[in-house]
Amino acid sequence: MVNIVGEHATAHLRYDAPLKSDIEGLARPLSHWIRRTDTAHSLAGDAAMAVRAARPGRIATLILPGETSWGEAGNAELPPLLSLPAKPAPSTARVEQVAKVLLSGEPTLIVFGGTATFGAAPEHAGRIAAKTGCRLATQFFTARIARGAGRVPLERIPYAVPQAVKFLQAFRHIITVETGEPVAFFSYPGMPSLLKPEDCQVHPLIDAGEDSVTGLAMLADALDARAAQPRLQERNRQPAPQGALNPTSIAHALAAALPENAILVDESLTTGRETSGLTAGAAPHDVLQNMGGSIGFGTPVATGAALAAPDRRVFCMVGDGSAMYTIQSLWTQAREGLNVTTIIFANNSYQILKTEFANMGFGEPGPQALAMIDIDRPRIDWLAMAKSMGVPAVSVATAEDFHRRMIDSVKEPGPFLIEVKL
């Protein structure tokens, strides 16, 4: 990603005008590369350098003083074209050490992140699992996962600390691929920060920035697993659910409605807690998740996904509290005619904050605490909100209606919003 940030003209900065700020100081914690362009003449070259620096997974910030918009560029100086260096493979010693662990017969889990959760990497991992009996999983939050029928299934380490500890308690070895060892998202009284057992060893195999496809192929070769047949997810064609809306019926309806090659943006938090397991056998799709713990990630990411892949339908699952942060994304979707189905789970509360309140041992929140996390005074009219931004919308109160409306949303191009009343 390249961020281009405008600044006052250089000569104007000395007057401490409004909007003057330490842009570099603000950008530094969030950028891998920062440059301030001095003249219009150097702008083209600096922009090219920013693009080069902003390879996948990295952020470049280019600061442009006002005079770069009106100055004479002349013959712009461009840097020579250079191809990006190939990702390095992990060391042979690391691969051989991990191979010994997998051949030891002790319970082992491989945890994947980064670019290792889609493309060819999971296929190599599936062969390794078929050969050795190890299990494959992702962190609870993973940027992108290829899921669905015909793909190598990856388990998901639970979010809640007690469930995560239980999930990991049987393993004596954890192998990491483009991620670190599992840790709790927050610290809670009386609960551990490290989720693995004390006698469980962690073995880094592939670091972030290294080539997971090559590294896992090397490991498969070291295990003589290239010919092994990975277990692939079977298609689960359950009938569409009927009756009341709850996390289970919502997940079943979604699994039945997802078209092939869809993109599922998941910021459903509490209501979507059953989605991961119950959509595993849906049609092949990609899941995009929030990596930073922010609120309001869903609708902008769905907008970007639809712009990047206009031939694929995007489903965005988002809570009503989260959606209020970035609901203006609907206007962009309408303006650009983007193929996004936004699903608003309307429980009229920041339910995730109530859960975290309870996790701290505070019990039930009182009136003052509830006043900060309930959003029902006034209650948000999501249909009117969507209509005001040019997006058609419906409200559903049963599982069968929810399923039918998701199917209908795919039949016509452009954005659509479904309010799920809870």
Give the predicted meaning of each segment.
Residues R231-D311:
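Active-site diphosphate/adenylate-binding microenvironment
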Residues G6, V177, D266, G319-D320, ...:
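Active-site flanking residues adjacent to catalytic metal/cofactor-binding acidic residues
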Residues H173, I263, R313-F315:
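Structural motif
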Residues A11-L19, E274-L422:
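Thiamine diphosphate
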Residues H12-L13, T39-A40, L84-P90, G150-I157, ...:
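Short, flexible loop segments at the rims of nucleotide/cofactor-binding pockets, characterized by
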Residues L30-W33, L81, P230-G243, Q368:
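Short glycine/proline- and acidic residue-enriched helix-loop micro-motifs
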Residues M1-A227, A257, V340-T342:
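N-terminal alpha/beta PP-like core and its mobile active-site loop of ThDP/TPP-dependent enzymes
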